[in-house]
Design a protein with these regions (language model features):
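Glycine-rich FAD pyrophosphate-binding loop
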Residues: 45-66
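Extreme N-terminal leader/targeting segments of oxidoreductases
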Residues: 1-28, 43-47
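Glycine-rich Rossmann-fold phosphate-binding loop(s) that bind the pyrophosphate
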Residues: 32-34, 56
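N-terminal Rossmann-fold NAD(P) dinucleotide-binding loop
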Residues: 37
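Flavin (FAD/FMN) cofactor-binding and adjacent substrate-gating region
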Residues: 113-192, 200-210, 229-234, 315, ...
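Dinucleotide-binding Rossmann-like beta1-alpha1 core, especially the glycine-rich loop
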Residues: 69-151, 461
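Core beta-strand elements of the Rossmann-like FAD/NAD(P) dinucleotide-binding domain
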Residues: 24-26, 244-255
Length: 560
């Protein structure tokens, strides 16, 4: 088995090694365990930097497990004239389709051309032609009405004149983050979850900080060496609090990078910087595939406001999204769908799939993510740009904005910005493949070809070890999902699982795939957790209660 992610698994949280780990001399301290932070960790580690990533909650806890699950160029950006962003995204999509096969997969989209509705056939065909040109291949096709209805049999037929099909891609966003983190670990990167930044440390404040918090030799109290040394007020590290043990630590680094996404303004405020982000919420519905059966994705324009909405098959269920509204709730709390957003998305479904007569009780789960969007003052949230930004302020490099698809580009841009602050480091910063292709799995009669490809994509070089570690019956799928029991055991054993929600919402996606968050399979989940994590009956009961309370408050349909 490959070395596991730092931070855990054992009944005590596996945190005993943290003081020695944090006392090392680090080149980069990366704050934030989503796709942006993971990407920076990977690109830094593979180029020889000593890089440490800390995440205050769980890896992919924020936006990176609550995205729309699409790896796409963004057709709508063409309408806004953002050709550079679309071209960059399309190229990264093509890289990921090749390099992360089984995790990033092609997804065909169908878009109906309805009489009198925008954008209209000619405009949409023009956009798709540009899209294909950027990808270097033709993936668009126009179909007359009858043929389009055969491809998408449940869509509304009134006023339908035909339709277009085009290709994008989809992924399991949380598993993409974990795959990147595992790859970074292979190159010497270190990632720790449930380790929150309480305060940024600044050069010149070391003595005061050490006196106030009782830092001891060997616990990160060393003076910083490098570009920031001697510049009073410059960020040079962080005071951390362990979310599992409540212990406090200090860590120093030559450069501190904030990759905290929609939460970036919080760290920036410690240095007196004014807010620059506009958190926007994107909410989604999850329905059973049998109630909304789709052979391919369906893209549509919402009848109320003309915004794009999609429905597509994902992990054995059907996803519907997304909204785009200002998120004004407390950023310290998890985002959740609102009653108005449920109504908005259901209205889109009723308009596009009238004969299915979908109702709210069909919904298995909901989820909401908060996008880190740079505030430009647009009255319409959907008009805000989706480009990434880098700000260097008193030694803190903030990397925010951008899209899931372009995480590699964002990471390389961050390292280019960091390079002048890391004297003596002159690595080549040209793009490299995100992943090296893992060897094929040995034949196993309990796994189909598609299941084997899925495991290779999600676990890379560790896929064979996962299969070999499976107990009898653990290569079977769970409750109609595409997840197998062996994935639960593997995650509990070696993927820094600290809480039940980590296992069911991010290491696997059972919390989105099964009704009630997976309550019907809890007995078997319990057996795995107690065997691999050493949880007592009391601990299991507390974890189950906390998870189900979280699921009911943030992943179910809100009460009217």
């Amino acid at each position: 088995m490959s070395p596991r992610l730092n931070g855990g698994g054992a009944a005590d949280g596996g945190r005993d090694e943290l003081p020695a780990l944090l006392a090392r001399e680090w080149d980069l301290l990366i704050i934030g365990g989503g796709i942006t932070g993971a990407g920076i960790l990977l690109e830094a580690a593979r180029r020889g930097l000593k890089a440490l990533l800390v995440e205050q909650r769980d890896f992919a806890w924020g936006t990176s497990s609550r995205s729309s699950k699409l790896v796409h160029g963004g057709l709508r950006y063409l309408k806004e004239g953002k050709f550079g962003l679309t071209r960059e995204s399309v190229r990264e999509r093509e890289h990921l389709l090749r390099e992360a096969a089984g995790l990033v997969e092609p997804q065909s989209f169908a878009f109906g051309d309805y009489r009198g509705r925008k954008p209209g056939r000619r405009m949409f065909q023009l956009g798709l032609a540009i899209y294909d040109l950027m990808a270097g291949q033709r993936a668009r096709h126009h179909y007359p009405r009858d043929e389009f209805l055969a491809l998408a049999p449940n869509v509304a037929s009134a006023e339908l004149e035909g339709g277009m099909c085009y290709t994008d891609a989809k992924t399991d966003d949380a598993r993409l983050v974990l795959r990147v983190l595992h790859e970074a670990q292979r190159h010497g990167g270190v990632a720790v979850n449930y380790l929150a930044v309480e305060q940024l440390l600044r050069a010149g404040d070391d003595a005061a900080q050490d006196a106030k918090h009782g830092a001891k030799a060997g616990q990160g109290a060393k003076p910083v060496q490098g570009a920031t040394a001697g510049q009073n007020g410059t960020v040079c590290g962080a005071r951390l609090r362990d979310g599992i043990t409540e212990a406090t630590h200090q860590v120093r680094a030559r450069l501190v990078v904030s990759a905290t996404g929609a939460w970036a303004d919080g760290l920036r405020a410690q240095g007196g910087a004014a807010p620059r982000l506009r958190p926007l919420r994107g909410s989604h519905l999850v329905l059973p595939a049998w109630r909304l059966p789709l052979a391919q994705a369906v893209s549509l324009m919402h009848p109320a406001d003309g915004r794009p909405v999609f429905a597509f098959p994902w992990e054995g269920v059907t996803l519907v999204g997304t909204t785009d509204v200002d998120h004004r709730a407390n950023m310290a709390h998890e985002a959740a769908i609102t009653r108005a957003e449920v109504d908005y998305l259901m209205a889109a479904l009723h308009d596009q799939f009238p004969q299915l007569a979908l109702v709210e009780r069909d919904i298995i789960a909901t989820y909401a993510g908060v996008r880190p969007v740079i505030d430009s003052g647009q009255s319409d949230p959907s008009k805000e740009g989706r480009e990434h930004a880098l700000w260097l302020e008193n030694g803190l490099l903030t990397v925010t904005g951008g899209k899931l698809t372009t995480f590699r580009v964002i990471a390389l841009d961050a390292l280019k910005k960091a390079a002048p602050l890391l004297p003596g480091w002159n690595a080549e910063l040209q793009p490299q493949p995100v992943f090296v292709q893992p060897p094929p799995l040995r034949y196993n009669r309990h796994l189909s070809v598609s299941q084997a490809a899925r495991l290779r994509g999600r676990y890379g070089p560790q896929a064979q070890a996962l299969v070999d570690a499976a107990h009898d019956g653990e290569l079977e799928t769970i409750g109609g999902s595409e997840t197998i029991w062996a994935q639960l055991r593997w995650a509990a054993r070696g993927e820094a699982v600290q809480k039940l929600e980590d296992l069911l919402l991010r290491r696997t996606r059972l919390g989105l795939q099964l009704r009630g968050g997976g309550v019907e399979v809890m007995a078997r989940v319990r057996a795995i957790c107690q065997a691999e994590l050493g949880w007592s009956d009391v601990r299991w009961s507390a974890e189950q209660n906390a998870y189900l309370a979280l699921w009911n408050s943030h992943y179910s349909v809100p009460v009217a």
